Curated annotation (Swiss-Prot):
Compartments in which it is found: Cell membrane
Primary location class: membrane
Cofactor: Zn(2+)
Active-site residue numbers: E134
Membrane topology qualifier: Multi-pass membrane protein
Binding locations of Zn(2+): H133, H137, E207
UniProt cross-references to InterPro entries, sorted A to Z: HtpX_protease, Pept_M48_protease_HtpX, Peptidase_M48
Biological source species: Pyrococcus furiosus (strain ATCC 43587 / DSM 3638 / JCM 8422 / Vc1)
A GO BP annotation: proteolysis
Gene expressing this chain: htpX
Keywords assigned by UniProt, alphabetized: Cell membrane, Hydrolase, Membrane, Metal-binding, Metalloprotease, Protease, Transmembrane, Transmembrane helix, Zinc
Keyword Amino-acid biosynthesis: no
NCBIfam families the record matches: PRK03001.1
Name by which UniProt lists this protein: Protease HtpX homolog
GO CC terms, sorted: plasma membrane
Length: 289
């Protein structure tokens, strides 16, 4: 892993740890701060070593063998070979909402996950385009930062919800400085926005890069563009409602569109702009669509 990635990963962990500790202090003073710091250390450790298992468990994703999904495995193996990385494990998510994501701390410990809905609506070329995009995230080593951000942002949301509960049900110490109560209310409002902005910062530019790299790996930018249009349309009609919004930036298209996100804080670039860029890449490759 390059020095730049180590630095980015360290800064991300430090910032999110600080956010967790700050919220912990506002909830429970010094004791809350110590508990939050302990939780942060625990989450940092597990988000690095077991991030893939954590994210897969959130979506009940199941690792499938070559016997269970031979065609899918063949596609993943071919594209991984073309990208020059080890073949990732393959998982299927039991939801009809079409989407895909990659996770894992390194190319040697990566997983490509696709939903049942994706397998239903895409043809083979489109599926290759999507998987090439996800393999690009693995090749570019985006998956480590994406997954750590998802796990720690999820922890922040749990703490924020606990803080909200403590205010609503009177668990917060009323004898403490009223300024802390105001600060806690502000933290409840602003912490989720901060977590979303972090996801936005690490996601948008990397999505463009994964589109470009994936198009070159598969040689089918037109197929990826077609897949993005299909996924976008399906997500607008039926957004994912049972997942964890902290993982939105990990998917090829934000699956929570229309639920709690607005375009200003979208974790992904507009699909129309991504398709336009893919058109330019296709023209450079001598492909017109």
């Amino acid at each position: 892993m390059g020095i730049g990635l180590w630095v980015r990963t360290g800064l991300l962990m430090a910032f999110l740890t600080g956010l967790l500790v700050g919220i912990g202090y506002l909830i429970g003073g010094q004791g809350g701060m110590i508990i939050a710091f302990t939780i942060a250390l625990f989450m940092n450790f597990f988000s690095y070593w077991f991030s893939d298992s954590i994210v897969l468990s959130w979506y009940n994703a199941r690792i499938v063998s070559e016997e269970e999904a031979p065609e899918l495995h063949r596609i993943v193996e071919k594209l991984a070979m073309q990208a020059g990385i080890p073949k990732p494990r393959v998982a299927i998510v039991p939801t009809l909402v079409p989407n895909a994501f990659a996770t894992g701390r390194s190319p040697e410990h990566a997983v490509v996950a696709v939903t049942e809905g994706l397998l239903r609506i895409l043809n083979r070329d489109e599926l290759e385009g999507v998987i090439a995009h996800e393999i690009s995230h693995i090749k570019n080593r985006d998956t480590l930062i994406q997954t750590i951000a998802a796990v720690l942002a999820g922890a922040i949301m749990v703490l924020v919800n606990f803080a909200r509960w403590s205010l609503w049900f009177g668990a917060y110490d009323e004898d403490r400085d009223g300024g802390n109560i105001v600060a806690l209310i502000l933290a409840i409002i602003l912490a989720p926005i901060a977590a979303t902005l972090i996801q936005l910062a690490i996601s948008r530019s990397r999505e463009y890069l994964a589109d470009e790299t994936g198009a070159k790996i598969s040689g089918k930018p037109h197929a990826l563009a077609s897949a993005l249009m299909k996924i976008e349309e399906a997500v607008r009609y039926r957004p994912l409602k049972n997942g964890n919004p902290a993982t939105a930036h990990m998917f090829i298209v934000n699956p929570f569109r229309g639920v709690d996100f607005v375009e200003l804080f979208s974790t992904h670039p507009p699909t129309e702009k991504r398709i336009e860029r893919l058109r330019k890449i296709a023209m450079e490759m001598g492909i017109i669509f």
